[in-house]
Amino acid sequence: MGKIIGIDLGTTNSCVAVMDGDKPRVIENAEGARTTPSIIAYTDKETLVGQPAKRQAITNPKNTLFAIKRLIGRRFTDAEVQRDIEIMPFEISKADNGDAWVTVKGDKLAPPQISAEILKKMKKTAEDFLGEPVTEAVITVPAYFNDAQRQATKDAGRIAGLDVKRIINEPTAAALAYGLDSKKENQTIAVYDLGGGTFDISIIEIDNFDGEQTFEVRATNGDTHLGGEDFDNRVINYLVEEFKKQGVDLRNDPMAMQRVKEAAEKAKIELSSAQETEVNLPYITADATGPKHLNIKVTRAKLESLVEDLVNRSLEPLKTALADAGLSVGDINDVILVGGQTRMPLVQKKVADFFGKTRKDVNPDEAVMAIGAAVQGGVLSGSVTDVLLLDVTPLSLGIETMGGVMTTLIEKNTTIPTKKSQVFSTAEDNQSAVTIHVLQGERKRAADNKSLGQFNLEGINPAPRGMPQIEVTFDIDANGIINVSAKDKNTGKEQQIKIQASSGLSDAEVEQMVRDAEANAEADKKFEELVQVCNQADGIAHATRKQITEAGDALNADDKAKIEAAISELETAAKGEDKAEIEAKIEALIKASEPLMLAAQAKAQGGEQPQQSQKDDGVVDAEFEEVKDNK
């Protein structure tokens, strides 16, 4: 069985880890970093992911996508999406199914399709390290992700060529990583996870017995649209409004806004360790009076005043999670802070004040989620046997009943996997069919909750209202993904639905995206092969010219003209994109260069160099032979 990798698919950064023996190991990417920016850029020739995409963001703002996790599994009409439309430099558009998608160069792309590019990068990073294909993964998601968002994350994995064996909640993954370093007495921990785009709080009990650890999530809560991006946006707005006093609104200039975004993020980070910083962006824009420069001083106090309400927003879920777990602040042994935004002193102070104790950092480089996911991968593959994980469903599940009320079947914070049934009946006499409308949320009114889908159970025998017995069963798997069935106990007729969420991608759409991804992989491979053969052509042309110079008069004029013509034809071919033609021109140059080799040998034999040196000087021979080997 191959390795199951652990992937932290983050809003701002992503990371991959794997069990290396009995220890999880974070794998460095091709750029040598443990984390990869969750940024994707589409250029005319290729798709860039990670640091290469980030480097060109200023000059390509409309086609450089970031924070896509904030859109995954969301409807275009969601209030959070509408807010993002106002601030994102790229175009967020409405898909035919009502989802929030992104339009790039005239093409509509689904968030799972875009996220798959990051997952493919993580997959290749792991494959390069392991030296073998990787097909299975555990992927982290915010604990407060609903069913649509979880399903969309699984779709992203599938598009990337991964069988997602488990979706694991981020705070739970952090607890697993924490537990590895803390095999001591039983304890209850609070995991406060404020990342780039989402916030979660989980209350987790860790029981240690006879060398085995049980991680039981008691309660979870959060906000799937609260994170570092929101903090950045407050700083961006402040800088733009301050600069507006010069009479120029930078919001009309996408390239300028991208520079401001980078500077705002940098300033926010610097203010975690400094009391003040200066944002200096020369030549940010220009008007009729000439170039304009942005130079604004930002203090830590100013930053805190801009974002204090966001930090306070994170405290309400803490109270709810503790209440749901039936615990008080005094019952918490340790507070674990994870996510890049928790480096902010104001966040640390507010959390410390709330719990009455200082926090503990698990891993400052944010690789902690991937480590936990890798441990779960080890559990699933059988390489880790002393860990048991008991997670929960973050939101209540139920159906719409008479009067537009949501009747809950499975309460939030129920340990998963779980299954529950309840008997309902008809609302009218002789009703022959019922519609089962599946909901997720905490509101009493059905319309105020998230609709996950609906289906009909037909063929009910005529009977007075209230007489037929319709058994509705909810079945939640370990990924938190839901199956719902309805059965007429009188006739035995049954109908069921695997909730894909009414805002999700259909199987056909996912399959098409898988095929597109495979096609792109083939195109990427061809592009890489073309670059390699062009480099070979350039090297051979350069080496051959050098040999012509060294041969001097030993090479006759006709042979020299033929070789130079072959070089010219090769260089012309190398400017195109026909790999076969370039290879043919390489072969033609090799053939045309045979007299050059003879001339070089004759000249060498006429000199004072020993035979061994003649062999060593056969540079062209070695290069020609190498090209043949590569074909």
UniProtKB/Swiss-Prot annotation:
Coiled-coil regions listed in the entry: none
Molecular function in Gene Ontology: ATP binding; ATP-dependent protein folding chaperone; unfolded protein binding
Domain of life where this protein originates: Bacteria
Keyword Chaperone: yes
Modified residues (Phosphothreonine): 198
The entry's keywords: ATP-binding, Chaperone, Nucleotide-binding, Phosphoprotein, Stress response
CDD domains membership: ASKHA_NBD_HSP70_DnaK-like
Family: Belongs to the heat shock protein 70 family.
NCBIfam families per record: PRK00290.1, prok_dnaK
Protein name stated in the entry: Chaperone protein DnaK
